[in-house]
């Protein structure tokens, strides 16, 4: 697995100019927008960037070559999830540090417990996003997966919009729902969030393994 990780790192280093550009944009956003935005931006961006290594693997019969090495489909899938999630976590740490540094420089007030709780919310979000992206990219390839993901995000946005309209039509107060949720202990939210994230990850990994096993090399 170490060899696969090194391969992916070298693939990303070939795009170091893009990485530098993204970091520069993150730096500007950190000082010109709400600092919390840079945490979401940099974490999600890195997750997408690391997942793009799948496209390189399939290019020019790359899978055929990889499967001649002493690895199997399970090892490849495990490495891909570990690399993408690990890369996103590194970016998250960098973004959190940058958030606090920029807040100090701008003279913004800092509430460590609330700010960290806000930042931690982005971890399961980007992991779930990766759990959706990776099997789709393995199944449909680089080009088709972009179309599938675009349609999927559109459907999710439409469901959210229709759901909000339906609640408004039923005279259900969004603020009332928020107040009810605020009464739930933070630890309960954390346990539920972790459980849902782990469940989605297990299902996603199982799907990715089946997709890789069905491929012809």
Residue ranges of predicted features:
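Short helix-to-coil transition segments within interhelical loops
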Residues: 68-73
């Amino acid at each position: 697995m170490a060899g696969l990780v090194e391969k992916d790192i070298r693939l990303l280093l070939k795009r170091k100019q893009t990485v530098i550009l993204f970091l520069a944009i993150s730096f500007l956003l950190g000082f010109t927008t709400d600092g919390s935005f840079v945490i979401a931006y940099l974490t999600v961006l890195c997750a997408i960037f690391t997942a793009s290594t799948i496209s390189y693997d399939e290019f020019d019969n790359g899978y055929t070559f990889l499967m001649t090495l002493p690895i199997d489909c399970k090892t490849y899938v495990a490495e891909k999830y570990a690399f993408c999630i690990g890369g996103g976590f590194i970016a998250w740490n960098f973004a959190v540090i940058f958030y606090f540094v920029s807040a100090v420089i701008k003279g913004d007030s800092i509430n460590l417990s609330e700010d960290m709780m806000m930042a931690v919310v982005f971890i399961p979000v980007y992991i779930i996003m990766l759990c959706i992206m990776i099997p789709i990219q393995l199944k449909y390839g680089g080009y088709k997966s972009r179309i599938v993901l675009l349609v999927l995000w559109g459907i999710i946005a439409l469901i959210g919009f229709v759901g909000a309209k339906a609640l408004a039509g039923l005279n259900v107060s969004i603020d009332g729902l928020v107040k009810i949720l605020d009464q739930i202990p933070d630890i309960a939210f954390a346990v539920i969030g972790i459980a849902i994230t782990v469940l989605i990850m297990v299902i996603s990994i199982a799907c990715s393994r089946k997709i890789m096993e069905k491929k012809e090399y």
